[in-house]
C-alpha cells in the first residue's frame, strides 16, 4: 500500500490525491466507517455535530485507522466491504493496517 501511495504522490507533484477509508472510535466504544479526501478535517466536522447522523448520536473520539485508495470508487468499495463486517472484524482490520496506516492517538 505504501508504494501505491508514494507513486500517486509522485504523479500528483507531491499533492495527496485520492481518498481515505477511515474508521472512527465513537463514544460507547462504537465504530463508524467513512471515506474522505482529508480524514482529519472530516473528523472535525463529525465532532462539531455537522457530520453524519450516526456521529451526531455517537460522538467520535478519534480516528483508529485509515487506508488510502487512489480513486473514490475504490474507496467506496472498500467502505462497503468494511461496513459489512462485524464489529470484532473491524477491530481486527484496524490492527491489520499496521503502524504506517494507523492514525496517531
Predicted features by range, described:
Residues 1-60, 66-68, 73-83, 87-88, ...:
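GIY-YIG nuclease catalytic motif and its immediate N-terminal context
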Amino acid at each position: 500500500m505504501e508504494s501505491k501511495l508514494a507513486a500517486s504522490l509522485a504523479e500528483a507533484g507531491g499533492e495527496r490525491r485520492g481518498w481515505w477509508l477511515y474508521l472512527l472510535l465513537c463514544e460507547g466504544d462504537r465504530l463508524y466507517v467513512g471515506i474522505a479526501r482529508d480524514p482529519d478535517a472530516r473528523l472535525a466536522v463529525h465532532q462539531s455535530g455537522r457530520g453524519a447522523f450516526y456521529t451526531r448520536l455517537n460522538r467520535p473520539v478519534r480516528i483508529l485507522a485509515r487506508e488510502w485508495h487512489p480513486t473514490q470508487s475504490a474507496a467506496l468499495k472498500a467502505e462497503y466491504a468494511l461496513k459489512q463486517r462485524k464489529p470484532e472484524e473491524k477491530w481486527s482490520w484496524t490492527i491489520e493496517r499496521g503502524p504506517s496506516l494507523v492514525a496517531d492517538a
